[in-house]
Amino acid sequence: MAKQSVVKIKKKVKRVITDGVAHISASFNNTIVTITDRQGNSLFWCTSGASGFRGSRKCTPFAAQVAAEKAGRAVLDYGMKSLEVRINGPGPGRESAVRSLNNVGYKITNIIDVTPIPHNGCRPPKKRRV
């Protein structure tokens, strides 16, 4: 009979983070929600596409709301109480993602729009003809 060995596995200790930063990138095609700590280390991320929406339903405000709720609930295990929100992009899921983070139970301290605005830099792409 083979001798069985017992291997002890150390349990990973979750650190306690009281406040963090929620980066919301809202493009016209998708919404990406990333929650980090103050140093910028990513704790959890979720997108509209990863939440089960495909095609044109990814860019709806409801899809952004579901993605933000999913990310917010996943980070509750770290003991996070307050969030600073940084919004990037012109997409339709901007406000609904912030509202859903507030509904999860976070105290939102700041809302900062970090969308890059050109001071007459590169020429924009041509207009769509549908």
From Swiss-Prot:
- GO CC terms for this protein? ribonucleoprotein complex; ribosome
Q: Which Gene3D superfamilies match?
A: Ribosomal protein S11
Spell out the Pfam families in the cross-references.
Answer: Ribosomal_S11 (PF00411)
Keywords, sorted A to Z: Ribonucleoprotein, Ribosomal protein, RNA-binding, rRNA-binding
GO BP terms in the entry: translation
Q: Which InterPro entries match?
A: Ribosomal_uS11, Ribosomal_uS11_bac-type, Ribosomal_uS11_CS, Ribosomal_uS11_sf
Alphabetically, the GO molecular function entries are: rRNA binding; structural constituent of ribosome
Subunit and interaction comment: Part of the 30S ribosomal subunit. Interacts with proteins S7 and S18. Binds to IF-3.
- Role according to the record: Located on the platform of the 30S subunit, it bridges several disparate RNA helices of the 16S rRNA. Forms part of the Shine-Dalgarno cleft in the 70S ribosome.
HAMAP family, per this entry? Ribosomal_uS11 (MF_01310)
Tell me which family the UniProt entry assigns to this protein: Belongs to the universal ribosomal protein uS11 family.
What's this protein's name? Small ribosomal subunit protein uS11
Please report the organism this UniProt entry assigns to the protein: Xylella fastidiosa (strain 9a5c)
Q: Which gene encodes it?
A: rpsK
